[in-house]
């Protein structure tokens, strides 16, 4: 197994299944393009033994145009983008879909700038292209992002319909997790070689000329447009077959629509994206309380198969909440809600369902707004109400239009072996240090490790909070650590600015980087911090990381010192092993 972030997992598959990669980096998809460029520069090869050609264009519009041109020559091509970059590609996406040209665009889904720009994640960009004719496949985790990257490349070649493979920006693209990698032999064995040959045979060639991109008149345009229906009708089966083939090769099973929960559920949430893992955890907890609940995971969003959605939804369901991670001002409701509602209403009208469940729709997670177990519990509580809100928001307090749901106070019991928080200053190395910690734990122990990093849009100087989990089982928790076993404050100036001690579990470890000794530091702490540390019976430690860094010739970079202190205090790795692994990690970084 490997410890990697979502972008790295996707880029690895895209690189190995492509021949031409046109890029123009945009947050949060940038590292996919950057890694592909670096790999090509270092001579890494795809599964056919060739080095893909990576070219950076002047904009995202140029990148998708270069992809279009490469595809017309019979090459296998891909690109990566987000947000406004995706919007610039819309005209070419229409052309690619209309010409039934197979390719995959990997999207780290991000907020589209409206009243303000935001670099953070939601589905407002991918929802703006749902009408282009591209198929849309959504991954919910780092493991799924890797696997669905390959499934997309297989399904697009089988169906000839271009695919948008998307996953939540930052929450999945930048989350580090431990996954099972796809080997070259597995990828090579699953790719459809006959369809690749057919794609090459369709290349524009003066030896056997064809005409494309014509201007059509009213006498033929409509008929030609409808003639693509059979290709779209077959997409679901191609995706399902690709998922089945992947399951045979790897043992990991997926379905385009997958239900999780009580077989006779009465309340069900329909959702797609990273929030699925959070919903699954809440469902597991509610099932132990005897509640009949479930979550329906939407993976293949376009083409939307009403038939298979309804097959996955339990017949016993009485109320359904459909969640969208986007806002469409002026619309009757958000996109996924409208699709689900239409599917249910048509089935009821045609006599395929005896009853029509009550369906409500909600918005959540815009611009990476936190969506935790308390939000999921609030939604299930709303579904139990006699008259639930038909439209709602969750995760915020809406005192303007009063659409928000009151959040539940009870939270889920933690199943992690260790949960930790690290507070640092942008560019002080805290985030990089935590990434090293996660990879060291993931790669040198049998445990699963997860890391997520919260920071603002500034390049340097802002607060960074790194969230680390270690568990015996795969980690589905796509939300922030609320209560930690270990809290590290890497900057003394934060001690009276942020509520860090409040985030500590009873009996947890609080580590403070300070120039003051253990004898004098307590008197310098704010009384509120002293009170919280006493109340929680915290184990309080101090380290003069700046002094140690200077003595070791590290200048102001305290991150390595804080890393070693973390391993020493938590004993998640024995001291000698931690030191050796840390030295190896640093040697790789600085080669």
What kind of region is each of these model predictions?
Residues 3-9, 244-267, 280, 403-417:
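Glycine-/acidic-rich phosphate or pyrophosphate-binding loops and their flanking alpha/beta elements
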Residues 48, 52, 163-259:
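Conformationally flexible catalytic loops at phosphate/diphosphate-handling active centers
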Residues 20-56, 249, 263-264, 268-299, ...:
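Anionic-ligand anchoring segments at beta-strand to alpha-helix junctions in alpha/beta enzyme folds, i.e.
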Residues 168-206, 313-346, 578-588:
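Terminal amphipathic helices with adjacent charged low-complexity linkers/tails
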Residues 2-3, 303-307, 319, 323-334, ...:
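Active-site cofactor/cluster-binding pocket
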Residues 119-169, 193, 346, 350-365, ...:
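Conserved thiamine diphosphate
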Residues 32-37, 66-69, 89-93, 114-120, ...:
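Short acidic, glycine/serine/threonine-rich loops at helix termini
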Residues 1-128, 133, 150, 388-390, ...:
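Thiamine diphosphate
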């Amino acid at each position: 197994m490997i410890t990697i972030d979502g972008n790295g997992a996707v880029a690895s598959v895209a690189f190995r299944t492509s021949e031409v990669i046109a890029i123009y980096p945009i947050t949060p998809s940038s590292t996919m393009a950057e890694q592909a460029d670096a790999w090509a520069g270092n001579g890494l090869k795809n599964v056919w033994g060739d080095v893909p050609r990576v070219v950076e264009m002047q904009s995202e519009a140029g990148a998708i145009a270069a992809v279009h041109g490469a595809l017309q020559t019979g090459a296998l091509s891909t690109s990566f983008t987000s947000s406004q970059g995706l919007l610039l590609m819309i005209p070419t996406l229409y052309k690619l879909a209309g010409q039934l040209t197979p390719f995959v665009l990997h999207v780290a889904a991000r907020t589209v700038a409206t009243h303000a720009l935001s670099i953070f994640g939601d589905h407002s960009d991918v929802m703006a292209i749902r009408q282009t004719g591209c198929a849309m496949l959504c991954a919910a985790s780092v493991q799924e992002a890797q696997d669905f990257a390959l499934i997309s490349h297989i399904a697009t070649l089988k169906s000839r319909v271009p695919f948008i493979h998307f996953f939540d920006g930052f929450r999945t693209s930048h989350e580090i997790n431990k996954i099972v990698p796809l080997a070259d032999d597995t990828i090579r064995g699953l790719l459809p070689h006959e369809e690749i040959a057919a794609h090459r045979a369709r290349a524009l060639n003066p030896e056997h000329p064809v005409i494309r991109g014509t201007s059509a008149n009213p006498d033929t345009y409509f008929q030609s447009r409808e003639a693509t229906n059979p290709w779209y009708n077959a997409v679901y089966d191609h995706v399902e077959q690709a998922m089945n083939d992947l399951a045979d090769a790897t043992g990991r099973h997926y379905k385009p629509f997958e239900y999780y929960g009580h077989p006779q559920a009465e309340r069900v949430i329909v959702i797609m994206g990273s929030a699925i893992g959070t919903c699954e955890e809440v469902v597991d907890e509610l099932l132990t309380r005897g509640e009949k609940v479930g979550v329906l995971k939407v993976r293949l969003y376009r083409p939307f198969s009403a038939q298979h959605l309804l097959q996955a939804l339990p017949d016993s369901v009485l109320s359904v909440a459909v969640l969208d991670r986007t806002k469409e001002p002026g619309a009757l409701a958000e996109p996924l809600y409208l699709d689900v509602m239409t599917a249910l209403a048509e089935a009821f009208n045609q006599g395929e369902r005896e009853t029509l469940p009550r369906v409500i729709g909600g918005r959540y997670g815009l611009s990476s707004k936190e969506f935790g177990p308390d939000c999921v519990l609030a939604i299930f509580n709303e579904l139990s109400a006699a008259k639930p809100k038909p439209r709602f928001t969750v995760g915020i307090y809406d005192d303007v239009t009063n659409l928000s749901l009151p959040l539940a106070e009870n939270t889920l019991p933690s199943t992690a072996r260790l949960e930790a928080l690290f507070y640092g200053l942008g560019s002080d190395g805290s985030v990089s240090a935590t990434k090293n910690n996660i990879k060291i734990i993931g790669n040198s122990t049998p445990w699963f490790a997860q890391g997520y990093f919260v920071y603002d849009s500034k390049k340097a100087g802002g607060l960074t909070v790194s969230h680390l989990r270690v568990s015996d089982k795969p980690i589905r928790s796509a939300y922030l650590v609320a209560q930690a076993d270990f809290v590290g404050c890497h900057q003394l100036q934060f001690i009276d600015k942020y509520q860090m001690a409040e985030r500590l579990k009873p009996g947890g470890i609080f580590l403070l980087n300070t120039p003051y000794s253990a004898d004098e530091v307590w008197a310098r702490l704010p009384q509120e911090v002293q009170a919280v540390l006493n109340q929680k019976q915290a184990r309080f430690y101090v380290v003069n990381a700046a002094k140690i860094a200077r003595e070791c010739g590290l200048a102001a970079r305290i991150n390595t010192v804080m890393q070693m202190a973390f391993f020493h205090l938590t004993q998640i790795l024995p001291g000698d092993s931690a030191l050796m692994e840390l030295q190896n990690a640093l040697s790789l970084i600085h080669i």
